[in-house]
Curated annotation (Swiss-Prot):
SUPFAM superfamilies: Phosphoglycerate mutase-like. It comes from the Viruses. This is Uncharacterized phosphoglycerate mutase family protein R708. Gene3D superfamilies: Phosphoglycerate mutase-like (3.40.50.1240). The active site is at residues 9, 86. Coiled coil: none annotated. The record marks 151 as: Transition state stabilizer. Belongs to the phosphoglycerate mutase family. InterPro entries: His_Pase_superF_clade-1 (IPR013078), His_PPase_superfam (IPR029033), Phosphatase_SH3-domain (IPR051710). It comes from Acanthamoeba polyphaga mimivirus (APMV).
């Protein structure tokens, strides 16, 4: 059984203080860092995970500054966890490929050293395929607890995916505040998400 936590990144600077972002940064528009408060509540989220008995072997993160910073703060609570940058956890890119600090020419679309069929910009349907592909692969590659730090749009897509599997569940994907956490257990023997384990925590 693999326990999975998919977490939206913490509070981003450009939405909270756009003028400061414009004056002091203003280069990679898609790659805002966190606010000071964002760092604090990300670490708090890590402590809450630990207090619940969760102990991830791997913490996977999208390659954006805000997701990597969130993952790094969570990792301070789990010093034995391994932090892994996973390209395909990237934000939805419908109009143009995002240029970010780590990849100023655009984010790669490889998985496990191999090129995939995905590219940017992308349609909504290809984005859904990408989300389902990468989360499936990360679960396949693990037998212990994992954390996935990513973006609100990706979280919404995967919540809708679970809703399509279990229509009787009442899952709300319309709004995903900072650090929204989707939790579930995956039974690898039966190759399925355990319905009773699905939970969304909107608190931060």
């Amino acid at each position: 059984m693999v326990r999975v936590k998919i977490i939206r990144h913490s509070e981003r600077l450009d939405y909270t203080n756009p003028l400061y972002w414009l004056i002091c940064f203003g280069h990679y528009w898609a790659d805002s860092p966190l606010t000071k408060h964002g760092y604090e509540i990300a670490k708090k989220k890590g402590k809450e995970l630990a207090e619940s008995g969760f102990n991830p072997k791997y913490i996977y993160t999208s390659p954006y500054s805000r997701t990597m910073a969130t993952a790094t703060e969570i990792k301070t609570v789990f010093p034995n966890s391994h932090l892994v940058i996973e390209y395909l956890l990237a934000e939805y890119q419908p109009y143009f490929k995002h240029k970010i600090n780590l990849y100023p020419d655009g984010i790669p679309t490889e998985f496990n050293g191999q090129e995939t069929e995905f590219n940017y910009p992308e349609t909504k349907s290809k984005f859904r395929e990408r989300v389902e592909f990468i989360i499936t692969k990360l679960i396949e590659n693990n037998d212990e607890d994992i954390v996935i730090v990513t973006h609100g749009e990706l979280l919404k897509v995967y919540i809708d995916y679970i809703q399509s599997i279990y229509p009787d569940l009442l899952l709300d994907s319309k709004v995903t505040p900072y650090l929204t956490t989707l939790s579930f257990e995956f039974d690898k023997k039966r190759d399925m998400i355990i319905e009773e384990s699905v939970n969304i925590d909107f608190s931060n």
